[in-house]
Each structure stands twice: as C-alpha cells, then as structure tokens.
C-alpha cells in the first residue's frame, strides 16, 4: 500500500502527465531500447512507429495517477497473462523502472521535484511487486497443468486452410507428440518468429525475433491449436511483418515456437444467462471459439452471434457457421446474424437492436453476458449502443488486439489501467 503522502503527491502530478505524458513514454522506450536491445524481441515495434504504444502507456500512467488510491482494485490479470506469454521475468522490472523514472526526470526537469520522484518510485515498486507475485503464480499454474510448459515449446504446422483471400487458418500439433495444454475459449497463443531485420528498427543483415499474440479460433481439443491470421496489408504503412510471413512463407511441416495459451478474455460457461457475441473483421476469432464451446457445454443457453465484415468474400468460417446453424436449428437457442457493410452499412444501434433482442425479452437484456472484439472504433460504437439499449456495463467484456487503450467508460476503463511493461 502506498502512503497517504505519496498518493497526494502522485495525484498532484496529473497536470504534468497530461502535458508531458507521451513525451515521457516516447523517451522511455527510446532510451530503454538503446541500452537494452534485447527488449526489441519483446515489444512490437510497429506500435512504436505509429505511436500507439507510447500513447497507450502515457494514458495508463495518467489513469494510474488519477485513480492511484484505487490501485488495489485494478484487475492486473490481462497484463499478467501477457507478461507470462512473453516470458517477462522479475529481473526486467528494475530495468524498466529505471528508464521510466529517468524519462520522467529528464522531460519534466525541475518540475520533477525530489518529492515527486520519491512518490513515483514508491508507486512503481508497489505495482511491479504486485505483477511479479501474480506472474510467479501463473507461471507455476501454466507449467504444472496437464500438457503445460514454461517459456516456449515447438509446434509443427499440421495443415493450412484458406478462409478468405486474406485469412488463413493454421493448425499446430506438438512437435514432440506429447499432450498439449487445454485452454479457455477467448485465450490466445504467442508465436515467436525469427526473421531478418526490417531495415527500419533492425538492419536487414541482422536477425530479430518477432513476438505476436493470436487468438485461438477453435473450441478446445486435445489434438491441435488453430489460429486464423489475417494478412495485414499496410495503407501508407509497411505490411504486417509476421502476418505476411505466415501467409507467404509458412508451410505444412514448418516448426514454430510458441508459449502456452494465455489471456483472461474468456467466456463464462458457469452462467446460464443469455450470451451476446459481437465481432468485427478478424475479431471473430476469440468469439468463434466461445461460440463453439458454449454450444457444446451449454446447448440450452440462449446465444446470439453477430458478425460484421465488408462482404461475403471476407467472411471466414462460412461452412462451420452454416453447419452450426443447421445443427442447432431445432433448439431455437442459437441466432447467427451476418452484417455485410457493403450492403447494410457499418454496424449501428438499429442493427444491434434488431439482432441482439431476437430471442431475449426485455428483462433478460440487463443480465445478458456480452463479448465484443474488433477494431477500436467498432468496439467503442458497439459499447455505446449497447448501454443505450439497456445492456449493463458490468456484463460487457472486450478484447483489444494491440496496446491497451480505453474502449469503455471510466469505471470499465480501470480494467485497462494495468501495465508498465506492455507489448
């Protein structure tokens, strides 16, 4: 727990963080990568170039200062899971802290008084210790589970299926032939790919390890992991390095190192309330896993699945969705609604109202479990529309691909105020 004096001092720095936040975090990353180049193998540098990462971290620090007295209420687990997937160790925290606090002092200069620096040092140590304790527990849990492991394990590509012109599904089996860990629908695996530098962050004559998280897109099973990767083609930006490598170069028989499944954006199959799954684009992946597993575990549960994409040719899992619709037609509990923006326009309040209330009454709306995944503007609009329609904000859950940024309202945003090391 922080002292009351430190809490008051940190709150007093909010105007400074509003003024200097992104400058601080940009300098932090620059200095840390120069001094610790091995960290280049942990962080996604495209998020550095487009400023998503510095902006996200600056917002995290700002929100931490605003809500500093509520730090013990913050859910650390989304970032704890990500840290375990990345292999973050306790030895890294002092390094990160030194560079972060050093950047604060450099940017704020005389405004960073000894009292302010002492308070932020105390706060960083408290947050770092909370992360280290939680990560130690999760490392043990994931390694000791049946089929579990620590760090990375080699998996071989068993088959590849083209879902759309830009999305391919890759099926992985354990290279050693041993059991694999199960997972909860909504979780992701983390792949580590070593490639020549991109010529921007790393020279082309040097190798670099790229780390990416990919949501598992099938229901849990004991044979394989499936991830469905969209080929990211940049618009006035470079193409996605790892996604293009998978599409252009990875073939059946190739071996890929990966971390154990992780993530806390997971479906609650202990609840019997209706479930609403709303996804856009490649955000379908974790929600499709949730859909398939919920149908197996809770065939009598009311499920509404809404998927928005540009057109029919950009829709993955066509045959699987059709088969699910046919298999559960008689129960009347499953509703699948496809929204093609090419014809219907982007998803909006009217569309959500039309489809989300198909087989639930007004009383059930307030208790419906909602899961959202897709582009940030999509999720912000969907969340706003859902709240206006009477869905309860405590029941709205979301997954963000990339650095954590606030998607929902302030009290929900506290879920995102959690990281010092962020991928």
From Swiss-Prot:
The active site is at 93 (charge relay system), 135 (charge relay system). It catalyses: 2 nitric oxide + NADPH + 2 O2 = 2 nitrate + NADP(+) + H(+); 2 nitric oxide + NADH + 2 O2 = 2 nitrate + NAD(+) + H(+). GO terms for biological process: cellular response to glucose stimulus; cellular response to nitrosative stress; nitric oxide catabolic process; response to toxic substance. The keyword rRNA-binding does not apply. The record marks 29 as: Involved in heme-bound ligand stabilization and O-O bond activation. GO terms for cellular component: cytoplasm; phagocytic vesicle. Residues 1-136 form the Globin domain. The record marks 82, 399 as: Influences the redox potential of the prosthetic heme and FAD groups. It is found in: Cytoplasm. Its main location: cytoplasm. Heme b binds at residue 83. FAD binds at residues 188, 212-215, 400-403. It comes from the Eukaryota. Residues 150-268 form the FAD-binding FR-type domain. Keywords: Cytoplasm, Detoxification, FAD, Flavoprotein, Heme, Iron, Metal-binding, NAD, NADP, Oxidoreductase, Oxygen transport, Transport. Pfam families: FAD_binding_6, Globin, NAD_binding_1. Its EC number is 1.14.12.17. Residues 149-423 are annotated as: Reductase. InterPro entries: Cbr1-like_FAD-bd_dom, FAD-bd_FR_type, Flavoprot_Pyr_Nucl_cyt_Rdtase, FNR_nucleotide-bd, Globin, Globin-like_sf, Globin/Proto, OxRdtase_FAD/NAD-bd. Induction: By submerged conditions, in growing cells. NADP(+) binds at residues 281-286. Its cofactor is FAD; heme b. Belongs to the globin family. Two-domain flavohemoproteins subfamily. In the C-terminal section; belongs to the flavoprotein pyridine nucleotide cytochrome reductase family. Is involved in NO detoxification in an aerobic process, termed nitric oxide dioxygenase (NOD) reaction that utilizes O(2) and NAD(P)H to convert NO to nitrate, which protects the cell from various noxious nitrogen compounds. Therefore, plays a central role in the inducible response to nitrosative stress. Consists of two distinct domains; a N-terminal heme-containing oxygen-binding domain and a C-terminal reductase domain with binding sites for FAD and NAD(P)H. This is Flavohemoprotein B. It comes from Dictyostelium discoideum.
């Amino acid at each position: 727990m922080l002292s009351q004096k430190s809490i008051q001092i940190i709150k007093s720095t909010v105007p400074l963080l509003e003024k200097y936040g992104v400058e601080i975090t940009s300098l932090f990353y620059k200095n840390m990568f120069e001094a610790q180049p091995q960290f280049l193998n942990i962080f996604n540098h495209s998020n550095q170039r487009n400023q998503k990462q510095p902006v996200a971290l600056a917002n995290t620090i700002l929100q931490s200062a605003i809500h500093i007295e509520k730090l013990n209420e913050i859910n650390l687990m989304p970032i704890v899971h990500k840290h375990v997937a990345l292999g973050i160790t306790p030895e890294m925290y002092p390094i990160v802290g030194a560079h972060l606090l050093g950047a604060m002092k450099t940017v704020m200069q005389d405004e960073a008084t000894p009292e302010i620096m002492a308070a932020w040092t105390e706060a960083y140590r408290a947050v770092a210790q909370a992360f280290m304790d939680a990560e130690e527990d999760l490392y043990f849990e994931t390694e000791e589970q049946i089929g579990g492991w620590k760090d990375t394990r080699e998996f071989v590509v068993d088959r590849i299926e083209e879902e759309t012109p830009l999305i391919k599904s890759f099926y992985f089996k354990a290279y050693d032939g041993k059991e694999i860990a199960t997972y909860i629908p909504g979780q992701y695996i983390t792949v580590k790919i070593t490639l020549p530098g991109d010529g921007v962050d790393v020279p082309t004559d040097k190798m670099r390890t790229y780390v990416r998280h990919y949501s598992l897109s099938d229901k849990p099973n004991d044979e394989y992991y499936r991830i469905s990767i969209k080929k990211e083609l940049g618009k006035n930006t470079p193409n996605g390095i790892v996604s293009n490598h998978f599409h252009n170069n990875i073939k059946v028989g190739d071996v890929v190192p990966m971390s154990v499944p992780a993530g806390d954006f997971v479906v609650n199959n202990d609840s019997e309330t209706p479930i609403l799954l709303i996804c856009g684009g490649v955000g379908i992946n974790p929600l499709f896993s949730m859909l398939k597993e919920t149908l197996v575990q809770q065939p009598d549960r009311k499920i509404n699945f809404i998927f928005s994409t540009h057109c029919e040719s950009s829709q993955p899992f066509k045959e699987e969705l059709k088969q699910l619709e046919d298999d559960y037609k008689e129960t009347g509990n499953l509703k699948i609604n496809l929204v093609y923006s090419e014809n219907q326009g982007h998803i909006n309040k009217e569309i959500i109202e039309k489809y989300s209330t198909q087989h639930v009454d007004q009383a059930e709306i307030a208790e419906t479990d909602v899961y959202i995944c897709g582009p940030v503007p999509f999720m912000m609009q969907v969340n706003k529309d859902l709240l206006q329609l009477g869905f309860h904000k405590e029941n709205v859950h979301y997954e963000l691909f990339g650095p954590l940024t606030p998607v929902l309202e302030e009290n929900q945003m506290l879920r995102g105020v959690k990281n010092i090391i962020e991928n």
